[in-house]
Amino acid sequence: MGTVVEKAFRGEFETHLTVRPDARTVSGARLERWAGHHGLKLTRIVLDRGAMPDQPMLTEQGRGTLAEQRAAARLRSAELRAAGFSVVRVKIEAAPWNEDIPRTADEAAELSPVCHFEHHIKLLLSGEPEVASARAVAQRHSAHLSRNARRAARHARHERFVTQRCRAVGRPEARARLDALLGALAAAGLEVTEVEEEFVVHDDHPAVDAGWIDERTEQPVGERGQRRPEVTV
């Protein structure tokens, strides 16, 4: 294994702070009040399966370098702990157009093994059969489902999110895998409403997601090159 190169990834970032859920955090709305007071976005992610399916998460936008985002995350984590919350994970994602985003597998191999492309696809589904269909498609593409527990259903339809991870590849290959997943979702008749591409540059506790996504290195034969559906981003 070669030497890991520390990059700045200068540009736009999102920092996600996952808080351990408990009765006071979730039911008592303490975290919601704290987030509102500090100008952070609160999302309560519920994974479809895994070791820690309930994941209250605070999100903060930032610009600059990875080192600056890490420093800001340390300060924010200290504030949360001082307020009585247990921060179990800090995850920092760079925009795919930032500096130093890998274009090839060789460039990706120079980075920390925690670095990878991550794609988030929002679906609007109706009924358990569509959820089961989305789950089956996702599992064939190094992806799986989650939902936002704070988002109410709309007109008997509800949102699900598909998260796909692509490791040890450059952005063109990651985009090809995303396109294959989108094509498979469209072929299954599932409605895609949003697509987001990110590049994970820091994750201090990836085991929080243990048992959720069964990651593969190859996309399914027969689904390569499928046409990407039109979406609203």
Where are these regions (language model features)?
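Long, contiguous binding/interaction regions
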Residues: 2-233
